[in-house]
Amino acid sequence: MRRDIPQDTVRRNEQVRAREVRVIGADGEQLGILSRNDAIAHAKELGLDLVEVAATADPPVCRVMDYGRFKYEQQKKKAEAKKNQTVIQIKEIKVRPKTDDHDYDTKVRHIRRFIEEGDRCKVTVFFRGREIVHKDRGQSILDRIVEDTKDIAKMDQEARAEGRTLFMMLAPLPKK
């Protein structure tokens, strides 16, 4: 009965399928093309594993190494790459066409904080009842927000109407 090997694992020792493999020694020197059994025997003599590093090459390339250490280093690299990823969130600020000056200033302060933290910001103007007739007021609020944040943000997406809302996206300016 043949066990299927998960995709993310590498073939080692008896799992290597090719009859002949190009072997790289433990200290990086080329040992040449050997039969699979000779390569495995050589690795076992050194107390190490024969690990397939390039399966698509002809013949496949195998390296003599400690498989446990190899897996550990792969996990460390993966963790380091994951740690260095930055997740950009989209924060949303909601305003109304009749938002007063103090409330407007508070909303702009929040937008500035989100942008400075590196997040994108969606600014939404909500219209209630008959306010929808005055879309120009909503557009003027969005234009004013763009003007007040132009030193740290750029408009990522133009103002767009959707149902009873008008929204736009702001993104941080690229760092110099």
From Swiss-Prot:
Q: Keywords of this protein's UniProt record, alphabetized?
A: Cytoplasm, Initiation factor, Protein biosynthesis
Query: What domain of life does the UniProt record list for this protein's source?
Result: Bacteria
* Location of the protein in the cell: Cytoplasm
Q: Which GO terms describe its molecular function?
A: ribosome binding; translation initiation factor activity
Q: Name one GO cellular component term.
A: membrane
Keyword NAD set for record: no
Output the InterPro entries linked to this UniProt entry: T_IF-3_C_sf (IPR036788), T_IF-3_N_sf (IPR036787), Translation_initiation_fac3_CS (IPR019813), Translation_initiation_fac_3 (IPR001288), Translation_initiation_fac_3_C (IPR019815), Translation_initiation_fac_3_N (IPR019814)
What Pfam families does UniProt report for this protein, alphabetically? IF3_C, IF3_N
Main subcellular localization, coarse class? cytoplasm
One GO BP annotation of this record: ribosome disassembly
Could you say which protein family the record assigns here? Belongs to the IF-3 family.
Q: Which NCBIfam families does its entry note?
A: infC
Q: Which HAMAP family match?
A: IF_3
> Subunit structure, per the record?
Monomer.
Known function: IF-3 binds to the 30S ribosomal subunit and shifts the equilibrium between 70S ribosomes and their 50S and 30S subunits in favor of the free subunits, thus enhancing the availability of 30S subunits on which protein synthesis initiation begins.
- This chain's protein is named Translation initiation factor IF-3
